[in-house]
């Protein structure tokens, strides 16, 4: 047999047809989701406090970069396992160079009881980095504006602050939630006498948009398709009712305002997304049921779990893995939540060997299950259905923003592990956009709206935003709510 052979046993063929229909998102459903998505974007700009809606957080970036920005800027990106420190040289003419170092965050530090320990560590890394770049001593007249990429839920009343709402990514440090993280860091920076001043605190999605706009002025939106999903775009101040009466007079109603949507929470009210019983189970058994509804159907974190649940369901019907009893170690693995990650689907989709031998090895190595060719073909097809649904739903956020802002021709800057590593994701997303906007017969490379690989959002994006805020501050203009 070959991977192109569609012959499955009658019972599995019937099962696969059921899942093909269940996971296919027709164009009319996409239109329905997009229409409601636009309503949610508008509602978030009007209020943003509805727990079933999209927060639509103003990011306090009030200009577009035009590629002429110059200067040397520091950027830090606090991830779950590493701290990345980047020196960004903005050269103008849409060009830049970077120098960077990654510092491993000791695991105990993510749950330390002393909040100063984390910020001491970050400041020490900044000092080590600067000294490595200036072995003869840091110039006495140097001042490095710092772009701080802080990709944790935070409230911002200005570009220079970020009040942590809740820790994620394995961090759980007391006395930081509810506090502004910028002074906590700058206290440690100042103790070391480092010539650093805060230039901006940003989210990685905002940075993705701005970094890409710096090099490509057709960029209108930044998106993350990874373990989480998110989008950022520029709206107009006049379109954000929740800010009216709260801004200084120097901010023009026509001014652009970068919005960090945090639209993983789209449709938390479960009105339009085509959820299956498996999606409902994932939500019900998650730490936060009823939250991040869109993320749970599109992000890399959940795709492996979807496949696991369907395989387990098929096994319990007696259709696959027939030689293994429910008490066997192999089935215990299959019953373990989140035992499979998205790489399992990626490998299944990418395997073009005649007997699907790569998939066979994955089953042997991860689940210790010996599979038949038909079982492997079944799982490969399931992976295709799950991956295609995620890609088609993912473009609903892009389509909603483009329709709302009347962007007829633009680029969407995309980053994240699913976009970069999942087979056929970009092509399926492009096909979804084509179906929504009616581009039949137009080659993908000629589509009016194109998804492009983003520039480094958490490094270069943070630096460009720091440059924009520095220029605005030099003019004496405001960058936040009225005090």
Predicted regions span which residues?
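Hydrophobic transmembrane alpha-helix bundles
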Residues: 171-187, 229-246, 365, 438-459, ...
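Glycine-rich phosphate-binding loop and adjoining helix at the ATP-binding site
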Residues: 103-123, 154-213, 220-221, 237-265, ...
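Glycine-rich phosphate-binding loop of actin/hexokinase-like ATP-binding domains
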Residues: 95-100, 169-178, 209-308, 312-314, ...
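Intrinsically disordered, low-complexity regions enriched in proline, serine, glycine
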Residues: 86-87, 96-97, 157-159, 198, ...
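Conserved beta-ketoacyl condensing-enzyme motif
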Residues: 146-156
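ATP-binding/phosphotransfer module of carbohydrate and carboxylate kinases, centering on a glycine-rich
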Residues: 1-100, 104, 108-144, 190, ...
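A short acidic Gly-Thr/Ser loop motif
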Residues: 76-84, 151, 205-206, 224-228, ...
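Short glycine-aspartate micro-motif
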Residues: 71-77, 143-147, 200-202, 220-224, ...
């Amino acid at each position: 047999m070959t991977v192109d052979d569609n012959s499955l046993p009658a019972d599995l063929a019937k099962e696969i047809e059921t899942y093909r229909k269940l996971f296919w998102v027709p164009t009319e459903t996409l239109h329905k989701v997009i229409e409601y998505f636009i309503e949610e974007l508008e509602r978030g700009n009007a209020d943003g406090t509805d727990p079933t809606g999209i927060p639509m957080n103003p990011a306090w970036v009030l200009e577009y970069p035009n590629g002429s920005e110059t200067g040397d800027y520091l950027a830090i990106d606090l991830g779950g396992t590493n701290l990345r420190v980047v020196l960004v040289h903005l050269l103008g003419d849409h060009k830049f160079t970077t120098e960077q170092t990654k510092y491993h965050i000791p695991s105990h530090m993510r749950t330390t009881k002393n909040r100063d320990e984390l910020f001491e560590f970050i400041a020490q890394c900044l000092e080590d980095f600067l000294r490595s770049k200036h072995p003869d001593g840091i110039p006495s007249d140097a001042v490095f504006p710092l772009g701080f990429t802080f990709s944790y839920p935070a409230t911002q009343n200005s570009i220079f602050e970020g009040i942590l709402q809740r820790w994620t990514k394995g961090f759980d440090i007391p006395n930081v939630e509810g506090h502004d993280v910028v002074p906590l860091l700058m206290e440690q920076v100042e103790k070391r006498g480092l010539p650093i001043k805060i230039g901006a605190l940003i989210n990685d999605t905002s940075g993705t948009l701005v970094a890409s706009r710096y090099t490509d002025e057709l960029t209108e939106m930044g998106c993350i398709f990874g373990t989480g999903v998110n989008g950022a775009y520029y709206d107009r101040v006049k379109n954000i009712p929740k800010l009216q009466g709260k801004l200084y007079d120097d901010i023009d109603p026509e001014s652009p305002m970068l919005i960090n949507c945090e639209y993983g929470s789209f449709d938390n009210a479960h009105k339009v997304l085509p959820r299956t019983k498996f999606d409902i189970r994932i939500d019900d058994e998650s730490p936060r049921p009823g939250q991040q509804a869109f993320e749970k159907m599109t992000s890399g974190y959940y795709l492996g779990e979807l496949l696991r649940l369907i395989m387990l369901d098929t096994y319990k019907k007696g259709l696959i893995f027939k030689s293994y009893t429910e008490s066997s170690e192999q089935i215990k693995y299959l019953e373990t939540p989140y035992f499979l990650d998205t790489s399992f689907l990626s490998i299944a989709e990418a395997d073009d060997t005649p007997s699907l031998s790569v998939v066979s090895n994955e089953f042997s190595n991860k689940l210790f299950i010996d599979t038949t060719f038909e079982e492997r073909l079944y799982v490969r097809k399931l992976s295709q259905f799950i991956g295609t649904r995620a890609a088609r739903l993912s473009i609903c956020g892009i389509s909603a923003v483009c329709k709302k802002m009347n962007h007829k021709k633009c680029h969407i800057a995309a980053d994240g592990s699913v976009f970069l590593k999942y087979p056929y994701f970009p092509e399926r997303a492009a096909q979804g956009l084509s179906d929504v906007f009616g581009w039949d017969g137009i080659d993908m490379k000629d589509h009016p709206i194109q998804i492009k690989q983003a520039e480094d959002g958490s490094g270069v994006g943070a630096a460009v935003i720091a440059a924009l805020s520095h220029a605005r501050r030099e003019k004496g203009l405001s960058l936040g709510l009225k005090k």
